[in-house]
Regions:
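Generic N-terminal targeting/processing segments that precede catalytic cores or assembly contacts
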Residues: 1-366
Length: 366
């Protein structure tokens, strides 16, 4: 089981849903980066369930930084964050009954029954909590070099938000203080209604998120196997529930011609820009200086309250299952800060590879 991502800046995650704690280790950080613990708490609060739209499992996420920080700044050694699990209810789960669209059976096949299956174990969304805590440190580092990241709900069920503006910086800034991750109040109300309707039916609903990265310099990334798209996709598909990703215009490119999809170059205030951004800020796997924009398909939460057909893989028998645990009718609201954090990991890694370890700390030390 490999749980580390990144080369110059690497993140390792550990822990299980109903174990003592979950946590993360960040390695390769430059020394001297300020660690804003208030911002870490705000990011964790964005991920934490807080309304009738979310799971009833309430965790306080009282994290502890065990290493890598001294007097409020990174030391350059591995930074370890641990978050205790304080509200578990393992009796809601029955080992051997494979929950449809969950990892129960696949994990049993891979780990030969030695996996911690309670609450989904290491496959649980609970493990995204330390990912978000670590991501907050990375997002702060990016912000100091002028790079910002934001994610909103573009679609949930039949409810739609507007897409990011062509220059997404103002929209991304607004998302940092938004109570709900949409760009319009109307979309927030419509998305909430879709989620509540799914909950009332003992069902769940999925959707589409849209993420924008603003302020990246041109020339970051590699062709072929370590392209910006390749690395973002690799990392983002590690998030449970993500089933698809597209950059810029993505699949809409198939319905037009090159003359429709090409992004024309022009000069603007001494800078090379494109008139449109259908390629999502990436050409040949390398950033071109425009906003990097991508959409993710998020499946409906597989845990629903309706009876479902399954198998008891220990007995080799067909079975029926009704899930009684505490689960989200939709994870699309809570997945937004997770996407920001994973994108920040990839970008910090790429920027450090391109410009060196001290690049992200140069403004902090000035």
């Amino acid at each position: 089981m490999k749980n580390t991502f990144g080369q110059a800046v690497a993140l390792t995650i550990f822990g299980e849903s109903h174990g003592p704690a979950v946590g993360a280790v960040l390695d390769g950080l430059a020394p001297g980066l300020p660690v804003d613990e208030d911002y870490i708490r705000r990011q964790l609060a964005r991920r934490r369930p807080s309304t009738t739209l979310d799971t009833a499992r309430q965790e306080q996420d009282c994290y502890q930084i065990l290493s890598g920080v001294y007097q409020g700044r990174t030391t350059g050694s591995p930074l370890t964050i641990v978050i205790p699990n304080e509200n578990t209810r393992s009796e809601d789960y029955t080992y051997g009954l494979a929950r449809p669209s969950h990892a129960d059976y696949a994990a049993y096949c891979k780990y030969h029954g030695y996996e911690d299956w309670r609450g989904g174990g290491h496959f649980s969304g609970r493990v995204t909590a330390p990912l978000v805590a670590a991501g907050a440190i990375l997002l702060s580092a990016l912000d100091r070099v002028g790079v910002t990241v934001g994610t909103h709900i573009l679609r949930c069920g039949g409810a739609w938000d507007r897409p990011f503006a062509p220059d997404a910086a103002a929209d991304v800034a607004a998302l940092q203080t938004a109570e709900f991750p949409t760009l319009t109040c109307e979309a927030a109300q419509a998305v909430s209604a879709e989620i509540l309707q799914a909950r009332e039916r003992q069902d769940s609903v999925g959707g589409i998120t849209q993420t924008a990265v603003c302020g990246l310099p041109a020339g970051v990334g590699e062709p072929w196997f370590d392209s910006v798209e390749s690395l973002l996709s690799h990392a983002i598909f590690s998030i449970g529930g993500v089933k698809g990703i597209e950059f810029g215009g993505g699949f809409s490119a198939v319905s037009g011609y090159g003359s429709d999809f090409n992004d024309a170059f022009r000069m603007e205030r001494g800078r090379v820009v494109t008139a449109t951004n259908r390629n999502g800020g990436i050409n040949g796997g390398i950033t071109n200086g425009m906003d990097v924009v991508f959409q993710c398909a998020v499946k409906p939460t597989p845990s629903i309250g309706q009876p479902q057909q399954t198998v008891d893989f220990l007995r080799g028998e067909d079975a029926e299952l009704t899930i009684h645990g505490r689960h989200d009718p939709a994870i699309i609201r809570r997945i937004c800060p997770v996407l920001d954090s994973v994108a920040a990991l990839v970008l910090c890694d790429l920027l450090t590879q391109r410009f060196g370890t001290d690049y992200l700390a140069k403004e902090a030390r000035a």
